Regions:
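Helix C-cap/helix->beta junction micro-motif
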Residues: 31, 93-94, 120
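PLP-dependent aminotransferase class I/II
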Residues: 23-25, 122-207, 215
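PLP-dependent aminotransferase-like
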Residues: 7-68
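Conserved PLP-binding catalytic core of the aspartate aminotransferase-like
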Residues: 195, 199, 206-239
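Active-site phosphate-binding strand-loop segment of PLP-dependent enzymes
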Residues: 44-106
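Conserved beta-loop-alpha segment that forms the PLP phosphate-binding cup at the N-terminus of a helix
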Residues: 1-12, 141
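Conserved PLP-binding active-site segment of the aspartate aminotransferase-like
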Residues: 145, 224-227, 238-277, 285-288
């Protein structure tokens, strides 16, 4: 959908906060757009504040499209409504299209900003079933925007852009009359599970590594970590794959993202980290 959006609107310059999902830049590059990377401050947990908002507004000259995320990937923080409203007001006056990626919004238990498309004609909200319903192999998502924008984007998609399998799974997800299935209960249980397991991981990681590791606040189903310990290699040796965030603009080799999974998988991760610490292997590679 991000590629279709960019092809439909053909912006000459695209604004992207850093760090953020690499798919935004990839989409912009498909039409040869200039990418304006707007760095967020680590000391503010890579979150937007009023000072950052004012700085961002000063960098909007020439930008035709701005990518935002709520919550953001790979950090997991949400955008405050007052700050987003201020930014959207500025973008609306300048006729800048804002793409708000809410693919992880369901994990927060909040409604997000879909209703704002009525107020802001240049706002596009993108969402996905893939994340919250744990169907990564089924590429199924959607966007909401003003009718004229939706029509432009639809013309950039293949005529048959959703497979029969994806259609069927999507229909079943929305069908609360299926025996043994309640979408509302599933969402409630999933949000509670992720929240409990996230707190478990944060507690255990702090207990193991203390000030050797920074854990950034997250409202999504993942945690961004910063440590000089080469976690990626040490965990890979134990059959556990985490996200090395070295290739994210605005991050570096000390950053990693871990998924918040079910309790058995999270315990397996913690046990592997305890083993690394016990054997002193965090020093084996030195600083990466």
């Amino acid at each position: 959908l991000f590629v279709a959006i960019v092809h439909a609107l053909r912006p000459k310059r695209v604004g992207i906060l850093a760090p953020s999902f690499s798919g935004y830049a990839w989409a912009a590059q498909t039409v040869g757009a200039e990418i304006c990377s707007i760095p967020l401050r680590e000391e503010n947990n890579f979150a937007m504040d009023m000072a950052q908002m004012e700085s961002l507004c000063r960098q909007l000259d020439g930008i035709g499209l701005l990518f935002l995320a709520n919550p953001a990937n790979p950090v997991g923080n949400k955008m405050e409504a007052s700050l987003l409203e201020t930014l959207l007001d500025v973008c609306e006056k300048r006729r800048i299209t804002v793409v708000l990626d809410e693919c992880f919004i369901a994990f927060t238990g909040t409604e997000g900003y879909v209703s704002w498309i009525r107020k802001y004609p240049h706002l596009i909200v993108v969402r996905a079933y893939t994340k919250i319903y744990a169907i990564p192999g089924i590429r199924l998502g959607y966007l909401l925007a003003q009718k004229d924008i939706c029509e432009k984007i639809a013309h950039q998609l293949p005529e048959w852009n959703v497979s029969v399998v994806a259609q069927r799974i999507g229909m079943d997800i929305l069908n609360d009359s299926l025996p043994g299935w309640s979408r509302r209960k599933y969402l409630k249980d999933t949000i509670e599970l992720i929240q409990e397991e996230k707190e478990f991981l944060k507690h255990e990681l702090t207990k193991i590594f203390g000030n050797q590791m920074t854990i950034f606040p997250s409202e999504a189903d993942f945690l961004l970590l910063k440590t000089q310990i080469p976690l990626y290699r040490l965990l890979l040796e134990r059959g556990i794959l985490i996200r090395n965030c070295a290739n994210y603009t605005g991050l570096g080799q000390d950053f990693y993202r871990i998924a918040v999974k079910g309790h058995p998988e999270n315990v397996q991760l913690i046990e592997a980290l305890l083993d690394i610490k016990k054997k002193g292997e965090e020093k084996r590679y030195g600083k990466h």
